[in-house]
Amino acid sequence: MKNTFSRLFGFGDKESEFELQDESHEEIDKKVYEEIQEIPIVNITPNRYQPRTVFDDARIEELALTIRTHGLIQPIVVRQYEDEKYEIIAGERRFRAATKLGWEKVPAIIKNLNDTETASVALIENLQREELTAIEEAVAYQKLIELHNLTQEALAQRLGKGQSTIANKLRLLKLPEEIKNALLEKSITERHARALIPLKNEELQLKVLQEIVEKQLNVKQTEERIAKLLEEAKPKRKAKQKAVSRDTRIAMNTIRQSLQMVADSGLNVNSEEEEFDEYYQITIQIPKKK
């Protein structure tokens, strides 16, 4: 049987970037010790690559009650990094619930994975659960891109998602920390946060964030507020304007569409349009690095 994470990220494969041939039982045995072991909780540490930064105490309590009643049906998965020291690969919520129950030991399966494999498994395992906040999801995408030296398009293909989905999530990472924290705490939604992106001024972004929270603005109200601010920020046009030729309009629209395509690819492009008596001026800033 093909390993899900290996198939996606090509661990140990030389022929194809992301396809892993069926392993023999001997090869699997070298990689995974399938027997369940009872490991002291004090010897286990959380995964350093865990994308989830907020754990719902109430949900952990519910899980603990379920485990108390029915037992831990699915062991956690760990890897050994020192003598009698283990790092969680998958199952941190179960680990936290067992800790809350006061268990001294927890059932675990030990896998031999390197740092890159451990990080990838932890990130993808959480992404597949679809319980991450938008910021946690964005962090997971960014880490996978860095770990495997992928483009946004390549990552999207491997995860079966649209490239625009990946790009939109990653844009959230460029927002101020206060806005990212509001997303983590679920004070605002992802659509609220994305609406704030066109406001390039951080002070203005934080001001609108405060309005959203204090006035409990919905997404439509937020977008209308931001549209008004953007309109107010535009340079005042002169009363008399010369007629714009059809060719000029086509040229301007083509440039705008091209800039939007570049932005959709994940590159943070800043542009500014100015209108003068005899010409339009478009200033474009393209970062050297993503």
From Swiss-Prot:
Pfam families: HTH_ParB, ParBc. Residues 153-172 bind DNA. CDD domains: SPO0J_N (cd16393). The keyword Transferase does not apply. InterPro entries: Chromosome_partition/occlusion, HTH_ParB/Spo0J, Nucleoid_occlusion_protein, ParB/RepB/Spo0J, ParB/Sulfiredoxin_dom, ParB/Sulfiredoxin_sf. One of its GO terms (biological process) is positive regulation of sporulation resulting in formation of a cellular spore. One of its GO terms (molecular function) is DNA binding. Keywords: Cell cycle, Cell division, Cytoplasm, DNA-binding, Septation. Effects nucleoid occlusion by binding relatively nonspecifically to DNA and preventing the assembly of the division machinery in the vicinity of the nucleoid, especially under conditions that disturb the cell cycle. It helps to coordinate cell division and chromosome segregation by preventing the formation of the Z ring through the nucleoid, which would cause chromosome breakage. This is Nucleoid occlusion protein. It comes from Bacillus cereus (strain AH187). The gene is noc.
